[in-house]
Amino acid sequence: QSQLLSCILMFIGGSPGGTAGGIKTTTIAILYLTCWSVLKGTEDTECFRRRMPAANVRTAFSVLTVAGTAVLTGTMLILVLEHTGLIPAFYEVVSAVGTVGLTAGLTPVLTTAGKLVIIVLMYMGRLSPVTLALLFASRYKKYGKGRKLPEERIMVG
């Protein structure tokens, strides 16, 4: 139970502008406020009588998606490579992505392949998920300038 709570806190991390890792408290706040605005039936994400830009909302969801995918992929890789339990593997991976430095005792006994997975996740966590996503997406940006595709409304939920 305490490891799960620690994983949640490590994944969220600290506030922006500091040295803490994780997806940042403001990202979680924007995600929560966006869900709240959907439940209220309002179109805009609002906080303290201010409207959040749509770009911030998209970035927050992108950060969550990239970081969540990294955690899930890293956990699966550690499970396959190390033949360990789910909780210790998940704890190590979240600690690496959040650049926390805590361990459930698994790090010293990892194979070279497992250590490489953790190293890649640490670098990814240090650079932040959105920086990495923007780095890889920047080369596709020039092709979409000046054009808008038709809108398609789909049922969600």
Residue ranges and their predicted role:
Residues Q1-G157:
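Membrane-proximal intracellular helices of multi-pass ion channels
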